[in-house]
Amino acid sequence: MNMFISKEEWLDKNKRKSDMENSLLERTYTTLMGNVYDKDGYRWSPYRCITPGKGSFTGIWNWDTAFHSIGVSRWDTDLAKDGILGFTQFQDEKGKFPDIIWENGNIEGHYAKPPLFSKACEIVYRRDGDREFLKKMYPRLVANENHWRENRCRSGMFFYDSEDKGEEIYQLHVRYESGWDNSVRWDKTITDMWPIDLNCFAVMDYRSLTYIANELNLCDDAKMWAEKGVELADLINERLWDGKNGYYADANKLTGEISDVLTPASFMPLYINIAGKEQALSMA
């Protein structure tokens, strides 16, 4: 099952009032489609996958793939599903999705990225209703949640890590898992932190797993995921909200101290709609 419309149809359907906006839409389309790999000759073949940038960031990348699939699903859901299926087939025995599959076939699997594939699958499915795609992906998504819960969780909340502890490059790899490679957030040791964005992404993950389980008539699973999402949202508001200063931020998972470093990540609880009215007004 595929939802496909041509470039011209998509641009006409989404036509804006200004030339600048229309130019940006066309640039979006041509950039994504210009970075699609051919079906053959790669480790992920026969799936058609998208790279962040041919010649600059070769290979296929974890959450880049999720974002690419969300984007192209607006005009070609088969291509969106190819990207997701092509990348997630490299899931390891613990359930972790790697960070990168390079063009030459090598895999960077010590670390991952925040869990976004459930949300990507939900969005793609809402556009074409392909239940077989959901059936194929659901076990992979469940295994990935298990990886985060078993290997990246302390006292009910998630943290970033890498599988190469003891190596000189370990702390840098943990930063890579966050996607905020050189952020001042990590001037304090990243492995000591409960990151605000990661835990909000995990709430999104639970919500999408709830939706997918319901679509597959897995009622007990759906109930479990929904409960996990509510529990985590409550912990975010309990542990990552600084009531004295009126903001959300990362917190030290060993001491409970909330960081004084404010970044756009602090707005994630508002984005996923778990902040109360008082918190939202304070952050405005």
Regions found by a protein language model. Give the residues of each.
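Catalytic cores of carbohydrate-active enzymes
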Residues: 2-9, 15, 19-29, 39, ...
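Intrinsically disordered, low-complexity regions enriched in Ser/Pro/Gly/Gln/His and often acidic
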Residues: 3, 37, 50-56, 141, ...
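Short amphipathic alpha-helical segments, especially helix-boundary/capping motifs
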Residues: 2-6, 41-46, 57-61, 93-99, ...
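The feature captures the catalytic groove of carbohydrate-active enzymes
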Residues: 94, 98-116, 122, 131, ...
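Substrate-binding groove/exosite segments of carbohydrate-active enzymes
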Residues: 14-122, 126, 131-135, 142, ...
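Active/binding-pocket-proximal capping segment
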Residues: 86-91, 230-231, 284
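Long hydrophobic alpha-helices with heptad-repeat/coiled-coil character
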Residues: 43-57, 136-158, 276-284
